[in-house]
Amino acid sequence: MRTLRVAGAAFAVALTVAAAGCGGGGSSTPTTGPEIYKAYCSTCHGVDGQGGVGPELGGGVVAQKYPNIDDQIAVVTNGKGTMPSWRGRLTPDQIRKVVVYERTKLPG
């Protein structure tokens, strides 16, 4: 029974982090793919895209999962599963820049 409570608490913490958007964003608005990733994505997906609360994105993994860039943009924009929607929090230009960064430069 105790194991079930601990697992439930861990799940609740994970959902809270996901609902909070997996990142903060400082006082200045990030404009480049790496800046946007660091500010909004790295908390869940890891500094180098190695994964954590969210799945691994680096090393080409995300491009394999979403061969069509527009499919990945749709997930970031609208959310999917535990991935929160970034519509209204990031501009379409910021979303495109961070997706391109994740697909091409993120080490993994």
For the regions a protein language model found, what residue spans apply to each?
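Axial heme c-ligation environment in periplasmic c-type cytochrome domains
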Residues: 52-60, 77-108
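Bacterial N-terminal signal peptides that target proteins for export
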Residues: 1-11
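C-terminal motif of bacterial Sec signal peptides marking the signal peptidase cleavage site
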Residues: 18-21
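A generic local structural motif
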Residues: 2-4, 28-30, 44
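The canonical Cys-X-X-Cys-His
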Residues: 36-47, 98, 102
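Bacterial signal peptide processing site
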Residues: 23-26
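Processing junctions and N-termini across compartments
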Residues: 16, 35-38, 77
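Gly/Gly-Pro-rich "capping" loops immediately C-terminal to redox-active cysteine motifs
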Residues: 30-35, 50-75
